[in-house]
Every structure is written in structure tokens, then in C-alpha cells.
């Protein structure tokens, strides 16, 4: 299996962006291509067809490669849950919770074996693997326990691209410093440099590129202009960089920026809708009068519920709902909208019981069993009879109160969610719900009707069709600005995984 690796001088340099583009470009060439990230730290997760959990970014890269996501593409997923701890997902299954200083001792050897085995498995089905690193490959204090960067590149003898973010400044120092801190055998693997997020006239950079190529002996493959809307962010920090203002005609949907927000990829289909403004609102801000409020998923539901309460946002939401405003909770947000959340085994932390917002007739008990599965079900609202798909990722069971005549199941599978008769209070466990185009438009039309706006057409495809177009545009963008021939020519005819 031939191997390409993308590493970055810093976090947010554009590794995911470039890896995704490469996957689509290689697919166009007719290669059987797979993405790979040995270890990912993220709260955006996806569930595979066999119920395994993996990073959502690697699922997108799999779709770019024209293949089905599988856990071997991301054998280790670390999901931060606060207090310097992370849940460890290995080969799709939760295997424990660990602190950073304990991770190397308890999981390093096991993790590397999972990575090596996954690469061997992928080699049976694919011609080319495009690997993505994490952070920087030159973190001296972390290098001995780095499972993601040059250890993988060396294992595969991968043709490696170093990508750097010029927008933050210091790009030449970042590139040269990174190269100098690599071991000689690692540096030999770097076959090209890409400069990302350039603003301004390209010719102004020419003298710097000439110097960089002469100094390092490594070609600069391209300069990618700043294109922040071409690819979704993998990390919740990037929500801070999303900008824009709603017009008077826009439907404004507030998504609460929880401290431990998870799976905010749920809202990409809403962001892609013209006439919809998604506002990721910090808890300390005033809610105002949006068209809808969504409480998203959370890795630590009780802690984020307490943050809602302590900030005063919980009271604002309850007042807003009392006045007829539309409120939706997804996964952890669904649990928060209920009466109580109990954690008798202290799985999330030291709080054993917490009062919810009381907007839904629901009680939740967090337990050890983690539910991860894909779902297909039939909707009851709005309207009834639509087939929708999505996936569940939650650690807890929710029960509907007996005295809840005003609430109806959202789906045929009643445990997945509920809605009140007025259709302004919603809650469900289904991630990816807004990916279903007809259902999304019907839900938005409810909001538009309240504003006196005309309804949108509902006979549309699902978001995956739109995403395919976005992936093609991303690949076109990369192909226009990056010369990949030196990388492709550097690949051996046969590169067997050791």
C-alpha cells in the first residue's frame, strides 16, 4: 500500500483540509484510497455501520475517498471530558478514561499495536493511504509518546507533506524550525511544503518561497489562498472563528456554545441553508429573541447543565420557552431539557444528581453502557411518515414520565425523542437528524411560518448530496493551488506495510 502523510507545523494549519482534498483527488485518479489518522482528539464523532465510534473528520475523509467509514481509519479517538481527563475509544469501543499523564503508561503500547494492525487491515483493501498527523510532529516533550505523526510516517515510509499556516504569521520560522527538530530519517520523508491560508498578492511571496526551497532543499508544492468556508472545522475552538451577521430575512438559530460541546457537525446542514443564520452563542451572552434555540450534545452533560444554570442561560431558555419560543435538545441537550439527570456511579464526575430545565417529561440515568449505533426510523413530526437516518452516541437511559399526554414521540422508535403538541419543544438522541433534507426543511418551515415567511420547498435531497459537491469543490481548490506531481512521483511502485 502506497502512503502519503500530511503533517502540520502547528494545530489548525490545514491538515484535515488537505488530507480530505487529497482523498478526493486520488479517488478521481482511480486509486482505491483510504484516509487514516492513528489517534485523534475530538468531540465530533461518527458511528460506523457496525456500531463503532470514530472521528467525524475521518468519516468525511472516507466519503471523500468514495468509501465507507470504518474504525480502522481512526483506531484511537480521545474524547476530552474535562478535569484533564479523556475517554479512550480504541477500535470503535470505549475502553476507559484516563488522565494525560497516565495515558502513555496505560495505553501507548496497546495503542501502537492497534494502529499497526489497522494499517495492515487497510492494506488488504486499498492501494493508497492518506494519513493525517495531529498538532505538530516536533513537540519535543511529547515526541516519545506521539502515536500520530512521524512514527506513522516512518512505519509506512510515507511521502510526507508539511503544511503551514501563514495567516497567523511566522510561517518561515515554523517550517524551518519544524524541519530542524525532526530526526534525519524523518526529515528525509518530507517531500514537499504547502503554505496555507495566504491573503494578498501571490507574487509578494515569491522571494520567500525561493529562499525556503534553497535553504531546506524541499520544494514548495503550492500556496493555498484563505478559504475558510470550504471545509468544516474539526475542533470546537474553530467555532470562535465563524463569522457573519444575519440579515433581517434570515432565520436565526442559536446553538449554545457549551463548555464541552460535542458533535456540532450536526448543524452543518443548517449552516449550508441560505436564509438560515446559525449563531454559536456563549453562555454569558443574552439570548435575545431567536427563532429557535438548540442545546447540542455534550461530553459531560451534568457539568454543562450546571454551567447553563450558573450562567443564567438556563433561566433565559425557560422564559423563552414559556413565551412560546422553539427549543430543541440533541443527545446531551435532550437530557438537559428533562426533569432530572442522575449519575449514581459518578461516571461523569462527582455530582450524583442534577435538576434539569424541566421542559420535557423526561428523567435520565447515566450508566456504564454506551450506546453507539446507526438508526433508520419514521418520523411522527413534522410531518409524519418521513424516513430519516442518523446515529446515537450516548451514555445514559432516558425514560418518559407517565403524565406526559401533551408530548408525542418524534419517531416510530419512541425512545429516540419527543415533541409537544405545539411543536415548540423538541428533544431527541438522533445525531445527523438535520442531514435529512425533507425533515430539515419541514422543521425550518415551522419556524418560517411563525415569522410569516413563505415555506421552503421540501422535495430536496439529503445533505450528503450537498456534501459531495462541497468535497468536489474542495478538491478542485486544492488541485488548482497545489502541485502534487512531486509527491505522486516519489511514491514507490509497491510500498508494503512493514
Curated annotation (Swiss-Prot):
Pathway: Cofactor biosynthesis; adenosylcobalamin biosynthesis. InterPro entries: Class_I_gatase-like, CobQ/CobB/MinD/ParA_Nub-bd_dom, CobQ_GATase1, CobQ_N, CobQ_synth, GATase_3, P-loop_NTPase. It comes from the Bacteria. Keywords: Cobalamin biosynthesis, Glutamine amidotransferase. PROSITE patterns: GATASE_COBBQ. SUPFAM superfamilies: Class I glutamine amidotransferase-like, P-loop containing nucleoside triphosphate hydrolases. Belongs to the CobB/CobQ family. CobQ subfamily. This is Cobyric acid synthase. It comes from Synechocystis sp. (strain ATCC 27184 / PCC 6803 / Kazusa).
